[in-house]
Amino acid sequence: MNRLASLALLLSFTGCVGSAPPPIPLKPVRFLLINDVYIADTTEGGRGGLARVATIRKRLADQGPVVFVLAGDALSPSVLSKYYRGRQMVEAFNAAKLDYATFGNHEFDLELDTLVARIAESRFKWVSSNCTRAGGSPIPKVVPWDTVRVSGHKVGLFGLTLEGSYPPEVRCIDPDSAARRVVDVLSTEGADLIVGLTHQTAQADRDLLAREPRIDLILGGHEHEALDSTVSGRHIVKADANAESAQFVTLWGGKGSWRQAVGLVPINAGLPRDTAVARVVAEWQDSLRRKLGPVRTVGSTTIPLDPATSVSRRSESLLGNLVTDAVRTETGADVALINSGTLRLEKVIPSGPITNHDLEELFPFGDQTRVVTFPLTGARLRRVLEHGVSAGVLGTGGFLQVSGLSFTFDPARPSGNRLVGDVRRGGRAIAPGDSIRVAFGVYPACRGGDGYQLPEASAACAQQASAPRAVDLLMRYISGSLGGRIETPKNSRVVQAGHTNPG
């Protein structure tokens, strides 16, 4: 980072608000970025918190203009969003004085009408250059681009979201095509600085900068880990998820000759909380506690339960085994499948007592994690499993945790042919013509989530509103079948050829 910008940044965040930073040549354009913020409160260990980010924003604003942006993923998923559908996040962002947001893929977890309601409640602007209603009309109050004067410079902003399996009422077109069009518009509008607010992979961001030299800066999200990368001197920056850090970017110069300085700002207990934002966060947390009811112990676990996606999205996991065992046992199905993206928790559940609140946090998607039961032939079940292991090769949420069967797969083999040998149930191979009763979550089984297509589930899906919640099945299983004590579930269900399962 440039030495002068570094010193200004240090003064901003160490309490020296009254001290003027040393002058920076020309008037700078400054951004404060957060991304993938699913909870407004602090995370485990006391890190993060939008109230602390608001303090940083205020200190920066006291020194000069700063544009505060969110690069997607905030309205879902979380246990609060399961019940309040993102209202708590919008209210916190409003109090924190957010300026701009773009869509992350998880904004589309909400029904479109619900998302439109959240946008209407926002006192900040939503910008998306590639996501619209299915017919191509704009999502209400969402702009494809915007310009804003910052320190005398005309700054153009646009928003991009990665393509994905979204609800049918939403369409997100190819981000690169959308970017080319919107950059043409911003150039014609006379923008001095063009900034992309993106929610896609870092590699997609790099490719975009390499193809489009008129984009000066990308403020991104999606990976959950801080990043500062450059392409021809132009930065791609991302912060850590859940506001455990923010990125502070300073640019000075002029059109075609911008200099850039980037600083990662840890959000920790050393930063005071903004009073107004802290009050909003506390009110929503109190509301959630009342909704969930008294904390009660469901049982105890002799092993830590780790929901880390680095494990569960590529291999069998102990937590996945526990959940699928619960679903299979409590529904009476032959086989239970859970897409790994269902299991979300921002902490490890340690060995010891486990409460109803712990388990509610594990399933933040609400009705999407209801479970339906339906028949599949052995041949169709194998195709479903093939789809799941292909998701595992990519490390996505479509990788399946399973109960009631076992199989081996080889990620080096071609997609659709990665299962090695038989799929086995109860010690014998499942034949193509066998009829298997399968319990599966509503999101993949009924809504096509993660690319699953299961017409066999249509009759069960017609009753999905009354289907049991996975969290209720799990609580019943722990307190009933397990006698309140969780021990290591049987593993070696999903075996990767040549590897030992991490568990």
What positions do the PLM features span?
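Bacterial N-terminal signal peptides
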Residues: 5-15
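Acidic, metal/ion-coordinating pockets
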Residues: 16-283, 287, 314-326, 336, ...
